[in-house]
Amino acid sequence: MRSFLLASLASVATLKSAQAHPAHSTRGLSKRGIDLDSYRLKQPVSYTNANDVGSDASISSLTRRATAEETASELVKKVVPGATFRVADNYVGSNGVAHVYFKQTANGLDVDNGDFNVNVGRDGTVFSFGNSFYTGDIPTAPSKSKRDTIEPAAAFKSAVSVLDLPVSAGSATSEPKEAENTFAIKQSEGTVSEPEARLVYVQTNGKLALTWRVETDVLSNWLLTYVDAIDGSQVHAVVDYSADASYQVYPWGINDPTEGERTIVVDPFDKQASEFGWHSDGSKTYDTTRGNNGVAQNNWANKSASEYLNLPRPVSTDLKFHYPYSLNETDFQKYSNASVTQLFYTSNVYHDLLHKLGFNEQAGNFEINNNGAGGAGNDFVFLNAQDGSDFNNANFATPPDGQAARMRMYMWNGTTPFRDCSFDASVIIHEYTHGLSNRLTGGPANSNCLNVLESGGMGEGWSDFYAIATHLKAGDTRETDYPMAPWVSGKPNGIRNYLYSTDINVNPQTYIYVDPQTRVHPIGNIWAGMLYEVLWNLIDKHGKNDAGTPDFDSNGLPTDGKYLAMKIVMEGMALQPCNPNFVSARDAIVDADKILTGGDNKCEIWKGFAKRGLGKDAKYDRVARTESYDLPEGVCA
């Protein structure tokens, strides 16, 4: 493997904390007066944890079948008798647990928000499962002899009109695609890729509505809009693959320019996670910031996705990406190559770290060539530095496995000179973690599983949590408080409502603080605060590894509390149901520890959640949550 020198903007070993868009973020459609939060899906979701499965004789005694998929199918038939469904995805995690994902169908059409995930243990028995299947009356099938629905092009026009999309749709027509009941939308302008309409059902207000699922990528928002297929006048729900954020960066372990100096790092790639290195996809080697995991470039000109591969990026025939950068430079385009290099470096380091922790090809990670390791492939990340489409933010769009993701890093103009968030590792980590949480929750093939308000907020929380965890310093203790994005925002206390702290006087937020929230970032601040408590409980028990990568025991588990917490939380994402809430996600994390360690850390995990009101009797209600500060009997015995 050819070696190369990479000038990272410090020694990128410990990414900092924040990432997510600030509370004052101006998201694409928000600037047009459209509140996408009001269109979020609201279907009920349940999660049956390992303890509940074990205490239910009818489930625990379920006969093991020849394969995990067959065992999981029998469970679905038992839990939801009479339901029709298809296998949407499945894989076996690095811990031996099989994850099988089902999509509900009705009259031969998908129920787009009807999901059932079954986690099958290494012994072949059901470990836990999540369920959002519809159980009401199935409507009469639409007529095949005559169309009872509006035309797909009309649904597209309705979506454009209702959401005030920056798209020209007046001349739009539709053409059938190979997939049944799926149409390509032609003769429109303003989208990144060709729009598509597919006939599906969606659960809404306790019923199934027949809808056209209209897919439109308008760059700032990559949308699935569910337009009523009968009258075309109502939009039942909207899913947005994009997740916004904004923050700072330099070398792994240096979060931003306030923490250290730039240095040259030689061959930093992990040979197992990136077997082709960072500048090859296994079939071709590149002399620029392009490889199997991502391609980084400058997009100040705000070019569309079809032009990404032609955007300017640094070129070095000897792979020495060494470029000047000055904090005093007012013309940020003069250090464009340094910005692109930093973004490429930090994203690749994080890709490799997540791979070591279990976010691999089968689980839906981001690579062009999966090299026979499973998963869909063809989906690295487009990494746009100094993106010209916005200021004071960052953005990550996560389509399903097999489609390339997109990260856009903006300039921040709250200081003089402006600050470039590609030099803030916490922003990059926050954004990339949106890809992690979206690919794991509900399975790699389903990117619609963090779109209810609470689960969407938790997505922001996971992104903050991983940014904070990777930022911890050698001298930090549980008394150390962390802001989100203080450097890039120019605000010492960062951009969240409260610092991340185990001190209830510094951060008083508990479970009921979620009740009045109507936006995802305040909810994420609460969820990440709970995870911060769990993190320090595990560090106090197992110690803290301050190296850039974890050490593993003979069972493949991190030996320290920091990386173990990251591993357990990641495993919880894979276990939890599509669109979880705080309670079901907590249960999935407890279950994750049970899978990984046999429950060795249940006391520390429960104490962390119970301290913030998410104890054993906490109950979810959309407007009136019930707090609990009690521990389950015997967990700390």
UniProtKB/Swiss-Prot annotation:
<feature type="glycosylation site" description="N-linked (GlcNAc...) asparagine">
    <location>
        <position position="328"/>
    </location>
</feature>
<keyword id="KW-0865">Zymogen</keyword>
<comment type="similarity">
    <text>Belongs to the peptidase M36 family.</text>
</comment>
<keyword id="KW-0378">Hydrolase</keyword>
<feature type="binding site">
    <location>
        <position position="430"/>
    </location>
    <ligand>
        <name>Zn(2+)</name>
    </ligand>
</feature>
<keyword id="KW-0732">Signal</keyword>
<keyword id="KW-0862">Zinc</keyword>
<dbReference type="Pfam" id="PF07504">
    <property type="entry name" value="FTP"/>
</dbReference>
<protein>
    <recommendedName>
        <fullName>Extracellular metalloproteinase 2</fullName>
        <ecNumber>3.4.24.-</ecNumber>
    </recommendedName>
</protein>
<feature type="binding site">
    <location>
        <position position="434"/>
    </location>
    <ligand>
        <name>Zn(2+)</name>
    </ligand>
</feature>
<feature type="signal peptide">
    <location>
        <begin position="1"/>
        <end position="20"/>
    </location>
</feature>
<keyword id="KW-0479">Metal-binding</keyword>
<feature type="glycosylation site" description="N-linked (GlcNAc...) asparagine">
    <location>
        <position position="302"/>
    </location>
</feature>
<dbReference type="GO" id="GO:0008270">
    <property type="term" value="F:zinc ion binding"/>
</dbReference>
<dbReference type="GO" id="GO:0006508">
    <property type="term" value="P:proteolysis"/>
</dbReference>
<comment type="function">
    <text>Secreted metalloproteinase that allows assimilation of proteinaceous substrates.</text>
</comment>
<dbReference type="InterPro" id="IPR050371">
    <property type="entry name" value="Fungal_virulence_M36"/>
</dbReference>
<keyword id="KW-0482">Metalloprotease</keyword>
<dbReference type="InterPro" id="IPR001842">
    <property type="entry name" value="Peptidase_M36"/>
</dbReference>
<dbReference type="Pfam" id="PF02128">
    <property type="entry name" value="Peptidase_M36"/>
</dbReference>
<dbReference type="InterPro" id="IPR027268">
    <property type="entry name" value="Peptidase_M4/M1_CTD_sf"/>
</dbReference>
<keyword id="KW-0645">Protease</keyword>
<feature type="glycosylation site" description="N-linked (GlcNAc...) asparagine">
    <location>
        <position position="413"/>
    </location>
</feature>
<dbReference type="GO" id="GO:0005576">
    <property type="term" value="C:extracellular region"/>
</dbReference>
<dbReference type="GO" id="GO:0004222">
    <property type="term" value="F:metalloendopeptidase activity"/>
</dbReference>
<feature type="glycosylation site" description="N-linked (GlcNAc...) asparagine">
    <location>
        <position position="337"/>
    </location>
</feature>
<dbReference type="InterPro" id="IPR011096">
    <property type="entry name" value="FTP_domain"/>
</dbReference>
<keyword id="KW-0964">Secreted</keyword>
<feature type="active site">
    <location>
        <position position="431"/>
    </location>
</feature>
<feature type="propeptide">
    <location>
        <begin position="21"/>
        <end position="244"/>
    </location>
</feature>
<keyword id="KW-0325">Glycoprotein</keyword>
